[in-house]
Design a protein with these regions (language model features):
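Conserved alpha/beta enzyme-core scaffold
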Residues: 1-433
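Long, contiguous binding/interaction regions
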Residues: 438-619
Length: 619
């Protein structure tokens, strides 16, 4: 028995008085029929109004100058269509953490006279579904006039969504389709960034995704993960795809276990249909979903955030305008804090190395850019298509080096120059401009060894200098002597930077890395070196003594052989102390014949890469 409350949009608008503050739903909850009539009406009572909307992403609320006498928009989100209008002074931004907004409505700190929201049709018991669980309930309680726009195409979503028709003063039957957002196209560069992000996300992690090409790509690259959880302010098409892939079970979440949890719906018509009566996804209020303490109660909470630019110290400039749909400073801060409170949680900022104009996105400073997020003390990871920069626990110099290593190869030489001038890196820092362009990323791989030890392997980078120094100083005197055939006590910067800067053609170095408490640790290194005239390359290996007898050296040897053969190298040589039985065993496992000569306590090894087909014929 609610039909008697159904009125025309004009009758609803006749109840409005000049100066009133009207709350409007966001996204799927935006009452588009009411808003369109409000914009079109010339009635004199519709003047000097305040329209309050959490996120303005629709096309029904014009924000140009000609409507300034009728209304002024207030929003909590600086992105999407409101960005330029905020800068021009036509829209008011209310800076706030999203989890605090319900409290602002409850306390009256933000006054609301009327609430217009879109809802689903009611069930047989008179209960409709809210389509924006964010703060709509609090907005309804704060207003004297509550109007529901009933849309027959709206889904019935699960969670804290039920609202009885008795709680409304009037209803309007919608003549507009709900607000659908088209999906973003995904370029290869975002698939590469997403693949690098996926490599640092463990099975059982809890994630938060927004809207944009990065998140669309992540839905693809995370599809092979297991037991992921979802705790996200926005529910999107990308999350729908990820759940449908089977990667999400939510079994290891700390809150809302077994369910994906969100507060808003932003997506396509297909997603809305999929959510209809779907028990896998529950929607909860904003002050629950975005509360850092609630976010942090999920172990391994991964906040994946897009960035516009990042500087060499770790400061971030967020996107503005239509480049920013779901990652404004307010909700970025809450996700960031939540991940910091989470056991084994981390934040990941992802961005292409260059923007669409071909300008660098990793720069010396972001001080001249708007929408800065300056919380570099808590930064964890920055990811581009060229790799991952681990920042936690790093010095400013180490951060700068790590970020330069994932910048666009053509931008690195200039970044090195600028960083030297700014005294962020060593004044004598070596940099080979060609090394970035020829970095052999195809060598990168990972392998699980005994006792579940996962080791990632990749070609060495200039930013590995400090980790390689730490590896050197962990070795015993005997290990150093076995590797270098002399007693070396120190490994200063000058010497080590020459060691880690290689050209990848004549000299190849592959490091083995483990991740411990969110930071990288090099535990092994293998390399070959030759001159242009040499057909054979000399080899050497070293493995942290804590990780001996796990097969790491043998695996590195296989990687070196594969890489060398692709470079046209015809074989390996090596000098091994006769007492170094473990290293001799590694070489003996070669698929190729090993020729040995013992001279003065040193085995001189020669390993020609005889075609394997010939070896099989001989057998």
């Amino acid at each position: 028995m609610w039909k008697y409350k159904v009125v025309s949009p004009e009758e609803v608008l006749s109840k409005i008085e000049p100066g009133m503050a009207i709350f409007l739903g966001t996204g799927m909850a935006e009452p588009r029929t009411l808003v369109k009539h409000l914009m079109a009406s010339e009635e004199p009572n519709l003047q000097d109004l305040e329209l309050i909307q959490l996120v303005s992403i629709g096309d029904t609320i014009p924000i140009d100058e000609r409507y300034s006498r009728k209304f002024r928009l207030k929003t909590f989100f600086s992105g999407w269509i409101a960005s330029e209008a905020i800068s021009a002074g036509r829209v008011d931004l209310i800076p706030s953490r999203f989890s605090r907004i319900p409290g602002l409505f409850k306390s009256g700190a933000i006054h609301i006279d009327a609430t217009f929201i879109q809802i689903s049709p009611p069930d047989e018991n008179g209960y409709a579904c809210l389509l924006g669980v964010d703060v709509e309930r609090q907005a309804m309680e704060a207003a004297n006039l509550v109007v529901g726009e009933v849309n027959a195409h709206a889904p019935r979503i699960m969670g804290d969504t039920l609202v009885h028709m008795d709680e409304f003063n009037y209803f309007v039957e919608s003549t507009e389709p709900p607000l659908y957002l088209p999906r973003w196209s995904v370029e290869d560069i975002y698939l590469k960034i997403a693949a690098n992000i996926a490599n640092v996300i463990e099975d059982g992690s809890c994630i938060s995704l927004g809207i944009g090409p990065l998140y669309e790509a992540l839905a693809v690259q995370l599809a092979t993960k297991k037991h992921l959880g979802v705790h996200s302010p926005f529910f999107t098409d990308a999350l729908m795809d990820l759940i449908k892939s089977g990667a999400v079970t939510n079994r290891r979440k700390g809150v809302f276990r077994g369910k994906s949890s969100a507060s808003y719906l932003l997506g396509s018509e297909k997603m809305m249909q999929w959510l209809d009566h779907n028990p896998l996804v529950e929607f909860q209020p904003e002050d629950v979903i975005t509360d850092p303490k609630v976010i942090g109660s999920n172990d391994r909470m991964i906040a994946i955030l897009p960035a516009r630019k990042i500087d060499l110290t770790g400061n971030v400039a967020l996107h503005a305008g239509k480049g920013d749909v779901t990652a404004g400073p307010g909700n970025v801060q809450e996700l960031f804090m939540g991940a910091a409170l989470s056991k084994k949680g981390r934040t990941v900022f992802g961005l292409p190395s260059r923007n669409l104009k071909g300008m660098p996105n990793i720069v010396l400073s972001v001080d001249n850019l708007p929408f800065q997020f300056t919380n570099r003390e808590s930064m964890d990871l920055v990811v581009t298509e060229y790799g991952v920069a681990y920042l936690m626990g790093k010095t400013m110099r180490e951060r700068a080096q790590a970020l330069i290593d994932i910048a666009h190869p053509d931008d690195r030489a200039e970044l090195v120059r600028q960083a030297k001038e700014a005294k962020l890196i060593y004044a004598d820092q070596i940099y080979f401009p060609e090394s970035g362009a020829i970095y052999p990323s195809k060598v990168c791989c990972s392998h699980e060894f005994k006792d579940g030890l996962k080791v990632c392997f990749r070609p060495i980078k200039p930013s590995d200098e400090d980790m390689m120094r730490l590896l050197f100083y962990r070795f015993s005197d005997q290990a150093v002597y076995s590797r270098y055939f002399t007693s070396i006590k120190t490994m200063p910067h000058k010497k080590m930077q020459e060691y880690v800067n290689v050209n990848y053609h004549l000299v190849m170095s592959i490091v083995g890395i483990v991740e411990i408490s969110g930071t990288e640790k090099i535990i092994a290194e293998a390399r070959y070196a030759r001159t242009k005239q040499d057909a054979f390359a000399d080899t050497a290996f070293i493995v942290d003594e804590e990780y001996h007898s796990k097969g790491i050296a043998s695996y590195l040897f296989e990687l070196l052989i594969r890489t060398a053969r692709e470079e046209g190298i015809q074989g390996f040589t090596a000098d091994v102390l006769a007492t170094n039985k473990a290293m001799l065993k590694v070489y003996e496992k070669s698929p190729f014949p090993v020729q040995t000569v013992l001279s003065r306590g040193i085995y001189e090894l020669t390993i020609p890469f005889t075609p394997l087909s010939e070896l099989k014929k001989r057998d």
